[in-house]
Amino acid sequence: MTSHLFQTYGRRTIEFVKGTGTKVIDNKGKEYLDFTSGIGVCNLGHCHPTVLKGVQEQLDDIWHISNLFTNSLQEEVASLLTENRALDYVFFCNSGAEANEAALKLARKHTGKSLVVTCQQSFHGRTFGTMSATGQDKVKEGFGPLLPSFLHIPFNDIKALEEVMNEEVAAVMVEVVQGEGGVIPVDLSFLKEIETLCNKFGSLFIIDEVQTGIGRTGTLFAYEQVGIEPDIVTVAKALGNGIPVGAMIGGKELGTSFTAGSHGSTFGGNYIAMAAAKEVLQVSKKPSFLKEVQEKGEYVLEKLQEELQHVECIQNIRGKGLMIGIECKHEVASFIEQLENEGLLVLQAGPNVIRLLPPLIVTNEELEQAVYIIKKVVCTKNVSII
């Protein structure tokens, strides 16, 4: 069949028609264990009953109205996002790229400066601003010239950070775990030094939690585990559990820098998105839920290390919460395909890392099942190495 779609994705031929919890079913009736969560989107699993109920009820009332009018649902969700943290204001949008664009605009407007420091191998989006911020050449090929005033330093390199920081820097933007860059957690000392230098030079500290946010690492936001206070946090992906919604969250001192007309979004924060986000947050903020995520993350990481430690092709296993990377000594495309054949959906992060992003509602039994399948595949001599 002739496709009328731009070929912007390296799509697999499989098509899914049903999803419930951690499982999805293709159009031939085969069931899969989904350890992609739609690339970290469906943290509560597919068709979560609480989120489904909230969205269905909202569909009967009102779907969308202009942001020129009051929306109390936005206020409710904003309160849930800022509760018990040193962040006071929220701007709602539709995606992680939009949230990061808003953060970059706010940083420049608030500080009056233009230079932004980010990290090599980072990923912040595909708009011109966020693409310029991203530290991966493959994302930028063919789209130049990009926006000036972005510096990219090696991830976790304090010396490189110290060399570029000065009074001209508007902001430093960093991920707590580089997801697209290979599932590489940030060093605590690196984050602390960013905070110190931003305070010293009057720069804003932006943390991109688009993939790590909403409980993925065992706290609502990953940065909460390391005792720092960023000026801006961005979030999207899991905030709507499949309904497009993003948010840029800023400190109180930034509140006067975005005024009427200085930024906006037609669809951002509409009623359907807010209905989903409200239910997602009410589930994801529960201490018992987050504790289980931490425990399951520790459990599966330990199981993977135990089962794969002597496998020749495995170089490293790392992660934070239920965000895990299995680094191999060669490219993993053939592994990804074979895992799919065995009924396990996983992701690739760079050429040689298998990325696991299971729904946070996953059971220990399902984690064990995934570990078994992964071990079976990586130990199979018939898997081609490319």
UniProtKB/Swiss-Prot annotation:
Record Pfam families: Aminotran_3
Binding note for cofactor: Binds 1 pyridoxal phosphate per subunit.
Sequence positions that bind pyridoxal 5'-phosphate: 96-97, 123, 208-211, 266
Cofactor annotation: pyridoxal 5'-phosphate
Catalytically driven reaction(s): N(2)-acetyl-L-ornithine + 2-oxoglutarate = N-acetyl-L-glutamate 5-semialdehyde + L-glutamate
InterPro entries: AcOrn/SuccOrn_fam, Aminotrans_3, Aminotrans_3_PPA_site, Class-III_PLP-dep_AT, PyrdxlP-dep_Trfase, PyrdxlP-dep_Trfase_major, PyrdxlP-dep_Trfase_small
Keywords, in A-Z order: Amino-acid biosynthesis, Aminotransferase, Arginine biosynthesis, Cytoplasm, Pyridoxal phosphate, Transferase
Gene Ontology CC: one annotated term: cytoplasm
EC class of the enzyme, as a word: transferase
Subcellular compartments: Cytoplasm
Binding positions (N(2)-acetyl-L-ornithine): 126, 265
Pathway(s): Amino-acid biosynthesis; L-arginine biosynthesis; N(2)-acetyl-L-ornithine from L-glutamate: step 4/4
EC number per UniProt: 2.6.1.11
Modified residues (N6-(pyridoxal phosphate)lysine): 237
Residue spans crossing the bilayer: none
Biological processes per GO annotation: L-arginine biosynthetic process
Record-level Gene Ontology MF annotations: identical protein binding; N2-acetyl-L-ornithine:2-oxoglutarate 5-aminotransferase activity; pyridoxal phosphate binding
UniProt-listed NCBIfam families: argD, PRK01278.1, PRK02936.1
Additional note from the record: May also have succinyldiaminopimelate aminotransferase activity, thus carrying out the corresponding step in lysine biosynthesis.
Subunit composition and interactions: Homodimer.
Family: Belongs to the class-III pyridoxal-phosphate-dependent aminotransferase family. ArgD subfamily.
Protein name: Acetylornithine aminotransferase
Gene coding for it: argD
